[in-house]
Amino acid sequence: MGEIIHRSKTRPVRVGPLTIGGSNEVIIQSMTTTKTHDVEATVAQIHRLEEAGCQIVRVACPDERAAEAIPEIKKRINIPLVADIHFDYKLALKAIEGGVDKIRINPGNIGRREKVEAVVKAAKERGVPIRIGVNAGSLEKRILEKYGYPTADGMVESALYHIRILEELDFHDIIVSLKASDVRLAIEAYEKAARTFDYPLHVGITEAGTLFSGTIKSAVGLGAILSKGIGNTIRVSLSADPVEEVKVAREILKTFGLASNAATLISCPTCGRIEIDLIRIANEIEDYIAKIQAPIKVAVLGCAVNGPGEAREADIGIAGARGEGLLFRHGKIVRKVPEEQMVEELKKEIDKLAEEYFAKQKENKAALKGSAAQ
């Protein structure tokens, strides 16, 4: 588990309007918990996921009713839609026909070659990529007999088996995942996969657990994987509201500087010098910036003596003192504000910074468009 692996040469694969792999940013994915045939509930949950920053969403497609709901769901959402298929190739065909942007299916599990050929033909015609999803808990019997128990080598071998089936049919729009609930096994499997083939990798720790324990497990496992330059899409799997999965994924990516569209909070751990209700303020500001899709660093600090210096890298922040706070930008004090106005004043400044960022982005796009037209 040694050197850093740079994935800049990963094969690019289109998923709807997004390009996965290549030198593109890591994309956040989640999965709905609703019954897919319940279109209203599924669309409502996807809208909440979109608002939280989800960029690709997967839905279970276990039966005909779910597959038939795909066109209506697709029509009413704004992010790429993935259908999760197990065994039944007819459901894959129906989902592709219904407009999904990607399917998750293991070609070796859907029966005779002509069934696989039918799915690949439909996927090719529609430009729909296929994700091969290897899971340590459901490896093929022959692999378990060979290795005795789930191993990283066995997981990569399973992935290669499914990859070769698709490659033999001249299909290369492939994304691969190798998930395990054992963090060390997942890390090793992804490392080996990154050395073995150049298809984009969807990374995740499966069955991670509840919001608290699963967040920690995912942060440790995915952090280790991402730190090696591995991973093109990410999903945090939690026994919780899927919106929480997206929030955790965004925080993990922000930690590595891999989220270009997310605001970050810096806050101190508190101590005996604190004269303000810093924990409440920090939580309120964290909630406020959660949906801001701009790379702004915000600091909430409890000490007016050390605060500005400690948060020099922050774009905007407050440092509290008794009855008042110092509002600062880029480590320089802008003005003093009364304690009761601190939060609202900080929110106003955050909004200004976000507006400045979006205006700059708009200018840059216009300039690029202009130079391309010349």
Swiss-Prot record:
**What Pfam families has UniProt attached to this entry?**
GcpE (PF04551)
Q: Which InterPro entries match?
A: Dihydropteroate_synth-like_sf, IspG_bac, IspG_bac-typ, NO2/SO3_Rdtase_4Fe4S_sf
What the entry lists under Gene3D superfamilies is as follows: Dihydropteroate synthase-like (3.20.20.20), Sulfite Reductase Hemoprotein, domain 1 (3.30.413.10)
Q: Which UniProt keywords apply?
A: 4Fe-4S, Iron, Iron-sulfur, Isoprene biosynthesis, Metal-binding, Oxidoreductase
- GO molecular function annotation: 4 iron, 4 sulfur cluster binding; 4-hydroxy-3-methylbut-2-en-1-yl diphosphate synthase activity (ferredoxin); 4-hydroxy-3-methylbut-2-enyl-diphosphate synthase activity (flavodoxin); iron ion binding
Instruction: Provide the cofactor list for this protein.
Output: [4Fe-4S] cluster
State how the cofactor is bound.
Answer: Binds 1 [4Fe-4S] cluster.
Mitochondrion found in the keyword field? no
Gene Ontology annotations of biological process type = isopentenyl diphosphate biosynthetic process, methylerythritol 4-phosphate pathway; terpenoid biosynthetic process
Q: In which pathway does it act?
A: Isoprenoid biosynthesis; isopentenyl diphosphate biosynthesis via DXP pathway; isopentenyl diphosphate from 1-deoxy-D-xylulose 5-phosphate: step 5/6
Q: Summarize where [4Fe-4S] cluster binds, as residue positions.
A: 268, 271, 303, 310
In short, the EC number is 1.17.7.3
Q: Which domain of life is it from?
A: Bacteria
According to its UniProt record, which reaction does this protein catalyse?
Answer: (2E)-4-hydroxy-3-methylbut-2-enyl diphosphate + oxidized [flavodoxin] + H2O + 2 H(+) = 2-C-methyl-D-erythritol 2,4-cyclic diphosphate + reduced [flavodoxin]
Which PANTHER family does this chain map to?
4-HYDROXY-3-METHYLBUT-2-EN-1-YL DIPHOSPHATE SYNTHASE, 4-HYDROXY-3-METHYLBUT-2-EN-1-YL DIPHOSPHATE SYNTHASE (FERREDOXIN), CHLOROPLASTIC
Per the record, the similarity remark reads:
Belongs to the IspG family.
- Give the matching NCBIfam families: ispG_gcpE (TIGR00612), PRK00366.1 (NF001540)
Q: What does this protein do?
A: Converts 2C-methyl-D-erythritol 2,4-cyclodiphosphate (ME-2,4cPP) into 1-hydroxy-2-methyl-2-(E)-butenyl 4-diphosphate.
Name assigned to this protein:
4-hydroxy-3-methylbut-2-en-1-yl diphosphate synthase (flavodoxin)
Give the source species: Geobacillus kaustophilus (strain HTA426)
